[in-house]
UniProtKB/Swiss-Prot annotation:
Stored SUPFAM superfamilies: a domain/subunit of cytochrome bc1 complex (Ubiquinol-cytochrome c reductase), Transmembrane di-heme cytochromes
Family from the record: Belongs to the cytochrome b family.
Encoding gene per record: mt-cyb
Record's function text: Component of the ubiquinol-cytochrome c reductase complex (complex III or cytochrome b-c1 complex) that is part of the mitochondrial respiratory chain. The b-c1 complex mediates electron transfer from ubiquinol to cytochrome c. Contributes to the generation of a proton gradient across the mitochondrial membrane that is then used for ATP synthesis.
GO biological process, alphabetically ordered: mitochondrial electron transport, ubiquinol to cytochrome c
Stated name of the protein: Cytochrome b
MF annotations from Gene Ontology: metal ion binding; ubiquinol-cytochrome-c reductase activity
Keyword Repeat: no
Broad class of the protein's primary localization: mitochondrion
Transmembrane segments: 34-54, 78-99, 114-134, 179-199, 227-247, 289-309, 321-341, 348-368
CDD domains: cytochrome_b_C, Cytochrome_b_N
Length: 380
């Protein structure tokens, strides 16, 4: 009897082993949907971005008007642009929930998968940042100026590095052109790294909510989780469609409706909402270099999480003290996001500084201590 083609064909069997016959823990919850949702977000962003790039002009004299042209004159251009802009927000919501899931259930102990994930996050942030510059509105221009200028804090090479990135002595046409190039290129690098992410994940198999070995009780991915993922797809598409059609400008900045003007500074320069927590940490430190290092460390601290794991248990499901700390960290990050969007004045300055200190304390001190304490309590 001939073998099934999906198990023998060199190309199809890769798909089969990844999406059809993949042995999956039988008890993974809705929190495990976000990986596939991120894949869907990436596909949506690449497709809508491709159509936008067909009509966009990467030149400072016509970038703003080309975006207006897309919205006014291109067939369904307004829908493509709104989907792309709000798709980015949904992408980051899914990313942060995906990271929070990995943190809560101890998935970071799969070190290769986790570390590749952190690299993907950094590239995603870079892609979103350069993409935000492309419409060439006020916040695009000043956001690019302020954030790239942070590199000048690096000793010796800083000023040279900033001018090299700008392609001149200020944010100008050369900057816009190269940012468009990077914005087009980086998503494909992210696709490649996603493949590596999945490769390492399938080496170990998925984690599960209780953090115990699930080899004795696994089920095929299809049909169980493929249909479960489809439900997530419909919910995500519904949310993106609702945002794009009913509230397209809800998460954007009104300053970006004004064409870029190097002679007029907006009253409050701030990035998109998904970077505000890191921006608040940057602003909390009066020293420029210190702020830049804190900004970088606020993301790269995720690489230290596997090394700082002190508990004998993988998941937080049976660790009440660490659970409380986890939700306090979530609340702390929300406070930082709020502070990042506020003007630099009291009481926001001191709240931001306290929230920044506690953010790092959770990772470096409180979680390791709680894990150690819970180990002691297990022996009682």
């Amino acid at each position: 009897m001939a073998m099934n083609i999906r198990k023998t064909h060199p190309l199809i069997k890769i798909v089969n082993n990844s999406l059809i016959d993949l042995p999956t823990p039988s008890n993974i919850s809705i929190w495990w949907n976000f990986g596939s949702l991120l894949g869907l977000c990436l596909i949506i962003q690449i497709l809508t971005g491709l159509f936008l790039a067909m009509h966009y002009t990467a030149d400072i004299s016509s970038a703003f008007s080309s975006v207006a042209h897309i919205c006014r004159d291109v067939n369904y251009g307004w829908l493509i642009r709104n989907t792309h802009a709000n798709g980015a927000s949904m992408f980051f919501i899914c990313v942060y929930l995906h990271i929070a899931r990995g943190f809560y259930y101890g998935s970071y102990l799969y070190k290769e998968t986790w570390n590749i994930g952190v690299i993907i996050l950094v590239l995603l942030m870079a892609t979103a940042f350069v993409g935000y510059v492309l419409p060439w509105g006020q916040m695009s221009f000043w956001g690019a100026t302020v954030i790239t200028n942070l590199l000048s804090a690096l000793p010796y090479i800083g000023d040279m590095l900033v001018q090299w990135i700008w392609g001149g002595f200020s944010v100008d046409n050369a900057t816009l052109t190269r940012f468009f190039t990077f914005h087009f290129l980086l998503p494909f690098v992210i696709v490649a790294l996603t493949m590596v992410h999945l490769l390492f994940l399938h080496e170990t198999g998925s984690n599960n909510p209780i953090g115990l070995d699930s080899n004795m009780d696994k089920i095929p991915f299809h049909p169980y989780y493929s249909y479960k993922d489809l439900l997530g797809f419909f919910m995500l598409l519904l949310l993106i469609t609702f945002l794009a059609l009913f509230m397209p400008n809800l998460l954007g900045d009104t300053e970006n409706f004004i064409p870029a003007n190097p002679l007029v500074t907006p009253p409050h320069i701030k990035p998109e909402w998904y970077f505000l927590f890191a921006y608040a940490i940057l602003r909390s430190i009066p020293n420029k270099l210190g702020g830049v290092l804190a900004l970088a460390f606020s993301i790269f601290i995720l690489l230290l999480v596997p090394m700082l794991h002190t508990s004998k248990q993988q998941s937080l499901i049976f660790r009440p003290i660490t659970q409380i700390l986890f939700w306090l960290l979530v609340a702390n990050t929300i406070i930082l996001t709020w502070i990042g969007g506020q003007p630099v004045e009291q009481p926001f300055i001191i709240i931001g500084q306290i929230a920044s200190i506690t953010y790092f304390s959770f990772f470096l001190i409180l979680f390791p201590l709680a894990g150690w304490w819970e180990n002691k309590m297990l022996k009682l």
